[in-house]
Swiss-Prot record:
Gene Ontology BP terms: DNA replication initiation; regulation of DNA replication
Gene this chain is encoded by: dnaA
Binding site for ATP: 155, 157-159
Any GO CC annotation of this UniProt entry: cytoplasm
Region feature Disordered, mapped onto this chain: 87-109
One MF term in the entry's GO annotations: lipid binding
Record region (Domain I, interacts with DnaA modulators): 1-70
Source organism of the structure: Magnetococcus marinus (strain ATCC BAA-1437 / JCM 17883 / MC-1)
Protein family according to the UniProt entry: Belongs to the DnaA family.
Protein's UniProt name: Chromosomal replication initiator protein DnaA
Length: 447
C-alpha cells in the first residue's frame, strides 16, 4: 500500500495547489487494508480528517482505484500522534505597523505577476469598459468604483486586468500594500489560522492592505465560515477606505449559495462585464502575442486563427503556441497550410456545437453503459474509464469549466475532473487504442 500511496501523493500534487498539498494532503498517513477494498487513512485530528474527506476524498479514491485496478474506499480517522505545531506554508501578509508606518515592504509578497500590465492588455469593444474602470481604480484606489466587481467567462482576461491594477498601483506608489489572492487561497489560509490558532494574525494580515484583489470570488459561496470572515474583512477594508477588486464567472446576484449580505456588498460599487473578444480584438491579441514571441504572423493567418478559435483569449493564445511549436519542430514557415495542418482537430471541431448531455449519451452508448453510471459513485473500471473519457471530451469540446463539468457528473469536485482530463491527456500519447477511441468519439460527436 505504501508504494501505491506514494504514487498517489505524486498524482494529487499535480492536481491541487502547493498550499493545499503541503497543509492538508502531505501530512496524511496511509494505514492498512481493513477488508473489501477499504483502506484506513489518518490525519492529525478530526477536523483535518473531515476536511480532506469532504474536499479531496473522491480524488484520492479515484487515483488509488486506478492504480490498484479495483474500487477503493478510504476511511478517514484521526491520529493525534501526527499533530505537530508546524508553520503554515501559505502566503501571509505582514501587518501594517502602528503609528502609520508601512512596515518592512521587502518582506511583503503581493502575489502579483509582473507580466500582467495594462500595456500588455489588448483593448477592444468587448473589454473597453472594464479596462477604463480598472485604469481609473489603479490611478486613484478607493476614490471611485469601490468595490470593483469584474465578471465574465473563463479565459477572457479577468485575472490579467485585475493584476494590472495591482501592478499599476505599485508603479505609482511602491509603498502601497497590494495583495492578489485566489478565493481558494483565502479559504486555505483561514482554515490554517483556525487549525493553528492564529485567527488574530489572519485578520490583521488581510485588513492591513491598501488594495485587496480576490480572484474567482464565487468559490466562497456555500462555505459559511469563509463567507463570514470575508464579510468582516470586506467591511473593515471598505470602512478604512481601502480598495477591493473581485472577479467572478457571473453577476453577484447569479452566484448560487452566496449570502445576501455579501451579494449586496459585491454589487454596491461598479459591476463590469467582460465579454468574449470580437474578431478584430482576437486578431490584435494574436499579433501582440506573436510580436512578444518574436514571430511574424501574416494578416491572413491571424484572421484565420482568430476565426477558428472564438471561445476565449487563453485558447486563442494556446492555438498560436501550438502553431509556433509545429513550425519550429518541422522547420517550416508559418503559412495557411501549416496552420490548417497543426490545428486540423480544432478547425473540424467548429462544425458543430456539442453539449455535455450529447457527450454523456454518446460515450455511454460507445462503452455500453448507462448515462446514470457515468454520474454514479461507482469506481469500478467498467464505469470509471468511460467517465474519465466523457469528462475529457466535455473539457475539449465545450466551454464549461471544471466545476461545471463536475456538477454534471454527479456533483463531483473540480479536482476529480482535472485529474480525469490530465490522465486521459497523458495516456493517449502512449496508448494507441485510447487515441483511437477518442478519435472515434470525436468523429461521432462532430458529425
Amino acid at each position: 500500500m505504501q508504494d501505491f500511496w506514494s504514487k498517489a501523493m505524486d498524482a494529487v500534487a499535480e492536481q491541487v495547489s502547493v498550499q493545499v498539498f503541503e497543509a492538508w494532503i502531505r501530512p496524511l498517513k496511509a494505514g492498512g487494508e481493513v477488508g473489501d477494498g477499504q483502506f484506513q487513512v489518518y490525519a492529525a485530528n478530526d477536523f483535518s480528517a473531515d476536511w480532506v474527506k469532504k474536499r479531496y476524498g473522491g480524488l484520492l479514491e479515484e487515483i488509488l482505484s486506478e492504480q490498484l485496478g479495483e474500487p477503493v474506499t478510504l476511511l478517514f480517522a484521526a491520529d493525534p500522534a501526527l499533530e505537530k505545531p508546524v508553520a503554515s506554508k501559505t502566503q501571509t501578509v505582514t501587518p501594517v505597523q502602528s503609528g502609520g508606518e508601512t512596515g518592512d515592504q521587502e518582506n511583503f509578497h503581493s502575489g502579483l505577476d509582473p507580466r500582467y500590465t495594462f500595456d500588455s492588455f489588448v483593448v477592444g469593444g468587448c473589454n473597453q469598459f472594464v479596462h477604463a474602470a480598472a485604469a481609473r481604480v489603479a490611478e486613484a484606489p478607493a476614490a471611485a468604483y469601490n468595490p470593483l466587481f469584474i465578471h465574465g467567462g473563463v479565459g477572457l482576461g479577468k485575472t490579467h486586468v485585475m493584476q494590472a491594477i495591482g501592478n499599476r498601483v505599485l508603479e505609482i506608489d511602491p509603498d502601497k500594500r497590494v495583495l492578489y489572492i485566489s478565493s481558494e487561497n483565502f479559504m486555505t489560509q483561514l482554515i490554517n489560522s483556525l487549525r493553528f490558532k492564529r485567527v488574530f494574525d489572519f485578520k490583521e494580515n488581510f485588513r492591513s492592505v491598501d488594495v485587496l484583489l480576490v480572484d474567482d470570488i464565487q468559490f466562497i459561496a456555500g462555505k459559511k465560515a469563509t463567507q463570514e470572515e470575508f464579510f468582516h474583512t470586506f467591511n473593515a477594508l471598505y470602512e478604512a477606505k481601502k480598495q477591493i477588486v473581485m472577479t467572478a464567472d457571473s453577476f453577484p446576484h447569479e452566484i448560487e449559495h452566496l449570502e445576501e449580505r455579501l451579494r449586496s456588498r459585491f454589487g454596491m460599487g461598479l459591476v463590469a462585464d467582460m465579454q468574449p473578444p470580437d474578431l478584430e480584438t482576437r486578431v490584435a491579441i494574436l499579433q501582440k502575442k506573436a510580436g512578444s514571441e518574436g514571430l511574424r504572423l501574416a494578416d491572413e493567418v491571424a484572421f484565420f486563427l482568430a476565426d477558428a478559435v472564438q471561445t476565449n483569449v487563453r485558447e486563442l493564445e494556446g492555438a498560436l503556441i501550438r502553431v509556433s511549436a509545429y513550425a519550429s519542430l518541422t522547420g517550416k514557415p508559418i503559412t495557411m497550410a501549416l496552420v490548417k495542418e497543426s490545428l486540423k482537430d480544432i478547425v473540424r471541431g467548429q462544425d458543430r456545437a456539442v453539449t455535455v448531455e450529447q457527450i454523456q449519451k454518446t460515450v455511454a452508448n460507445y462503452y455500453k453503459v448507462k448515462v446514470t453510471d457515468l454520474c454514479s459513485n461507482s469506481r469500478s473500471r467498467i464505469y470509471s474509464h468511460p467517465r474519465q473519457i466523457a469528462m475529457y471530451l466535455c473539457k475539449q469540446l465545450t466551454q464549461h469549466s471544471y466545476p461545471e463539468i463536475g456538477h454534471r457528473f454527479g456533483g463531483r469536485d473540480h479536482t476529480t475532473v482535472l485529474y480525469a482530463v490530465s490522465q486521459v491527456d497523458k495516456k493517449q500519447g502512449s496508448t494507441p487504442a485510447l487515441a483511437d477511441e477518442l478519435a472515434s468519439l470525436k468523429s461521432m460527436l462532430q458529425k
